[in-house]
Regions:
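Ligand/cofactor-recognition surfaces for anionic moieties
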Residues: 1-208
């Protein structure tokens, strides 16, 4: 999550396996392109995710809806979604696609009631205590869908990375630096990391 990778989901509303196959191919093409210039700290993630999406179809992971899940970062999600939107517009995908994500994601809603020792009811948070949240966004090949992809996915991922960077997680700090370089309009205040010895000495002085 520190690097922005999380469970990106999509559903082909046509219900056609052929449309899901097309989305798999488009997602793989995006990941292949990203790997050409990817920094070392996320290269392994991209390689694993590329292997996953290439193998997903032959492993028959679909149960019911023609849907897929793929771990992807902000750039990956946005580029994949835009590729889907273009494919819908030109007819390679026959119907709209619904984008979403897991409730437990980079920018997912905190769940103060999550059961961390055992899960008895399958929900993970206890009966009646669910305060998680996700989203579903329909893309239909339109320019308006393209705008929503750019704005919604950008905010959804980078909001979480910023929060994690403020916790001084090295991966998140590097990820948000990279995003600010890629998106000049984004300005996130970076944390100041104090030397452990300075903090230790200050605490010792307070106690004495």
């Amino acid at each position: 999550f520190d690097y922005g990778f999380g469970p990106f989901r999509w559903v082909c509303t046509s219900g056609r396996a052929e449309d899901l196959d097309t989305t798999d191919r488009l997602a793989a093409e995006v990941l292949e392109e990203m790997l050409r210039t990817a920094p070392d700290d996320i290269r392994g993630q991209l390689e694993d995710n590329l292997h996953w999406i290439r193998e997903a179809g032959r492993n028959r992971l679909v149960v019911g809806s023609q849907a897929r899940i793929l771990y992807a970062d902000c750039e990956g999600r946005t580029r994949i979604a835009q590729a889907f939107n273009r494919a819908i517009a030109d007819g390679r995908i026959s119907a709209p696609v619904v984008l979403g994500r897991d409730h437990h994601d980079v920018s997912g809603t905190d769940s103060p009631y999550r059961e961390t020792v055992s899960i008895h009811n399958g929900g993970g948070v206890g009966w009646g205590e669910v305060v998680n949240g996700g989203f579903g966004m329909v893309i239909d090949g339109s320019e308006e869908s393209g705008r929503r992809i750019r704005e919604m996915l950008f905010w959804d991922v980078n909001n979480g990375i910023a929060r994690r960077s403020w916790a001084r997680n090295d991966g998140a700090v590097e990820a948000i630096r990279r995003e600010m370089a890629r998106t000049p309009g984004l300005q996130v205040t970076l944390p100041n990391s104090a030397d452990d010895n300075v903090i230790r000495n200050a605490l010792n002085e307070t106690e004495s």
